Amino acid sequence: TAYLGQPGDGTSPADRFNDFQNSLTTLVNMPSSNGAQTSVALAAEDLVRSVKGAATTLSTTLNDVNMEIRYEVADLNTALYQLRDLNASGSGFTPGSLEAAQFDEKVDTILDQISGIVDTRIHRSSNGSISLYTVSGAALLEGRVVQDVTFNPSDGTLMAGNQDITPFKDGVRGIQHGSLAGLSELKRE
């Protein structure tokens, strides 16, 4: 309604259609009236302008949402590769040392960033390596193997490697929370 207006505000496509319909009713009752004929033509022009304006606004909004999803996917992949690199470097620091605390802080910061984008489940192996999965079980990172997340703007599909993680899609291990789920919901609407 922010883009289309509210019914009754005088500017929404619904109001323009109502004006057009009313002008047609008047024309039916007074077919020879030049004023009624002109009124229909003007109301039709207003309706077309209103619908075109709404379509342009919605198209721009869809493009903006697609761009935001691309940014979030890029940020997610960057964070997954950073986490993979930390896995590869290992945390062979003395427990309780400054280096160990700094390493853990880096890992926690990256995990916080990722969990803001997608809902995750973390598994730490006995050697300290981190594997990361969506809550529904799709792998994002397993040790040193990153499942690149991709986005297809034409149909809204999100993939982690070969696994479909598109939110709100039946039969897939879709993400449920985080900014990608929210943006996907916005795209669907």
Language-model features, listed with the residues they occupy:
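Structural signature of extracellular appendage/secretion-system components
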Residues: T1-E189
